[in-house]
A protein has these predicted regions:
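A short, well-structured edge-of-sheet supersecondary motif
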Residues: 2-46, 272, 282-287
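Non-transmembrane alpha-helical segments in soluble domains
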Residues: 12, 65, 80, 106-109, ...
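Catalytic-site signature segments of enzymes, centered on catalytic residues
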Residues: 46-47, 115-197
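Active-site SXXK
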Residues: 51-76, 108, 154-158, 208
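Active-site helix/loop module of the DD-peptidase/beta-lactamase fold
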Residues: 70-111, 160-200
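Active-site-proximal alpha-helical segments within enzyme catalytic domains
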Residues: 153-157, 196-217, 269-291
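Active-site Gly/Thr loop motif
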Residues: 181-183, 226-288, 293
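Short, gly/Ser/Thr-rich active-site loops of penicillin-recognizing serine hydrolases
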Residues: 297-314
Length: 314
């Protein structure tokens, strides 16, 4: 039976052998005793807060889910409903592109708004208001188009109902998880960067993974409904012509590699979830922070293969 230590040892050996530029790794897996976990971790660099990049999109999904649980938003209602009269806060005369009046928060969080906006390192400052620029562009229907601007716009819409999203997440998500004084980058207009700009330690990112694995409950306290954690790895949007691990996308989650699904940020920030029935310890979460953009996919594939190998040795 594999343990957190056996998983950790195998992944550490692989990282050291391949030269993957890891900052830290945290492994959490269930034990044979009901309701208990086994945990192990290793650090190669000082355990300080670093940006988790697109892994922050999972936090945005949790924020939207909490607001939906409160009855403040409906993820399947057109966002035009929330923008009527108030706009985005920075302007009330908001112009929507053709077809955008039918776009919902779910579409924005699953990257299926059909609005095309290529990524730019300076996108938060390229326009007076990124969300307004995004929404004025036409929608091609329910077409997958990955864009940081999509998540950013979702959080701007959410802001019309919950107030400052950073404050809302701090109170309703970070505080129950024991996360204090978390920094989240803001745009020039004062709104959180949403799908990027969030800085966490390896173990802090792992706490979010723990919450997601346990379907919205931590230490017996429900923070968000299970359906929003499930939405990160169900109802996949299928993609064609892409590499392994990028063929399926849900609400912030990528399907694969292999038996895994994951939240994946640039430069190797990953929450790798193994919840298959084939696992002898279903519920394993491997958290990785790194500075190795091009080696991350191979490392995730190794983790998937190693979990399968350790299962076969049981």
């Amino acid at each position: 039976m594999h343990t957190a230590a056996t998983i950790l040892d195998a992944v550490v050996r692989h990282i050291d052998a391949t030269g993957f530029a890891a900052h830290g790794i945290h492994v959490r897996t269930r034990t044979a005793a009901p309701g208990t976990d086994d945990v192990a971790e290793r650090h190669w660099t000082p355990d300080v807060r670093r940006e988790v990049h697109s892994a922050a999109k999972g936090v945005c999904v949790l924020a939207a889910g909490i607001a939906a649980d409160d009855g403040l938003v409906d993820l399947d209602e057109p966002i035009a409903t929330y923008l009527a009269g108030t706009g985005l806060g920075t302007q009330t005369g908001l112009l929507l592109g053709d077809g955008v009046d039918r776009v919902t928060l779910r579409h924005l969080l699953t990257m299926t708004s059909g609005i095309d906006m290529p990524w730019s390192a300076t996108e938060l400052t390229d326009w007076p208001d990124l969300a307004a620029e995004f929404l004025r562009r036409p929608s091609r229907g329910r077409v997958f188009q990955y864009a940081n601007a999509s998540t950013y716009t979702a959080m701007r819409v959410l802001e019309t109902r919950v107030g400052d999203v950073g404050a809302f997440v701090t109170e309703r998500l970070f505080a129950p998880l024991g996360l204090r004084d978390v920094e989240w980058q803001r745009c020039p207009n004062g709104f959180v960067a949403a799908g990027e700009g969030l800085s966490l330690r390896t173990e802090e990112l792992a706490r979010i993974g723990h919450l997601i694995r346990d379907r919205g409950v931590v230490d017996g306290q429900r923070i968000v409904s299970a359906r929003w954690c499930d939405a990160m790895h169900t109802d996949w949007v299928e993609r064609e012509g892409t590499g392994p691990g990028y063929e399926r996308y849900a609400m912030a989650g990528w399907g694969g590699p292999g038996r895994l699904w994951r939240l994946h940020g640039a430069y190797g920030q990953m929450l790798l979830f193994d919840e298959t029935e084939a696992s002898n310890a279903p519920g394993t979460v491997v958290t990785i922070t790194a500075d190795d953009h091009f080696g991350a996919d191979a490392l995730a594939a190794f983790v998937a293969d190693e979990l399968a190998r350790q299962d076969r040795r049981r």
